[in-house]
Amino acid sequence: MSKYAAAPSPYSHQPQTPEHKSKTLVVGLTGGIGSGKSAASDWFAQQGIDIIDADVIAHEVVVKGSSTLRKIQRKFGDWVLNANGDMDRAAVRTHVFTYPDALIELEAITHPAIREAAKKQLAESTSPYVVLSAPLLIEAAEAGLANLCQRILVMDATENTQLARASQRDALSVQKIEAIMVNQLSREERNRHADDVVLNESDLAALYVQLEPLHQDYLKLAQQLKFAAD
């Protein structure tokens, strides 16, 4: 897979419209549960790279009193709120798991808000390039986050490694982890949409050895993009 040519993908993460034509290189970071996304994200942050975390944004856009939470309440009813006026995440999670169409309706509300918040953070970034971390960057094509990225970096790990890490880190049952994995792309499918793949099967030191040359490549690409935009 070419270091500098994007891999063909039906999810098309190449810039499509003027709003994506930024002088800042955006690297989309994704991977299955337990693949090491957080470890990679932390390492890039230690190198001075700004991190846009879609999971964090997803929580921020539905805080108590937010316009997004009010839209969810109007769509589904008052039961989406707990006694404190916060979103009852457990109730909402159970509802969308039981009624798949409800998940589509929920994401139609949350995805635009997440995308706009990500774009705002991108516009405010001052680092040489930006890492946009999103577990479902490829799967959730309708969210449009992948279209903000010029590169897709996939953290890869075997299913056994994913299960071991996730069960140790999150104290989840094997059944729960497997249920999460079912809703994510397979390793093979995810890797087909990647520009860069890091096989994370060992310790942090081994991971960092793989990330360093990618970081240097991204710095060079960021410079090329900046000069091309000037």
Curated annotation (Swiss-Prot):
Residues 26-225 form the DPCK domain. GO terms for biological process: coenzyme A biosynthetic process. Its main location: cytoplasm. The gene is coaE. It is found in: Cytoplasm. ATP binds at G34, S35, G36, K37, S38, A39. This is Dephospho-CoA kinase. HAMAP family: Dephospho_CoA_kinase. It catalyses: 3'-dephospho-CoA + ATP = ADP + CoA + H(+). One of its GO terms (molecular function) is dephospho-CoA kinase activity. Gene3D superfamilies: P-loop containing nucleotide triphosphate hydrolases. InterPro entries: Depp_CoAkinase (IPR001977), P-loop_NTPase (IPR027417). It comes from the Bacteria. Pathway: Cofactor biosynthesis; coenzyme A biosynthesis; CoA from (R)-pantothenate: step 5/5. The lineage of its organism: Bacteria, Pseudomonadati, Pseudomonadota, Gammaproteobacteria, Moraxellales. Belongs to the CoaE family. Residues 1-21 are annotated as: Disordered. Keywords: ATP-binding, Coenzyme A biosynthesis, Cytoplasm, Kinase, Nucleotide-binding, Transferase. Its EC number is 2.7.1.24. Catalyzes the phosphorylation of the 3'-hydroxyl group of dephosphocoenzyme A to form coenzyme A. GO terms for cellular component: cytoplasm. Pfam families: CoaE. Coiled coil: none annotated.
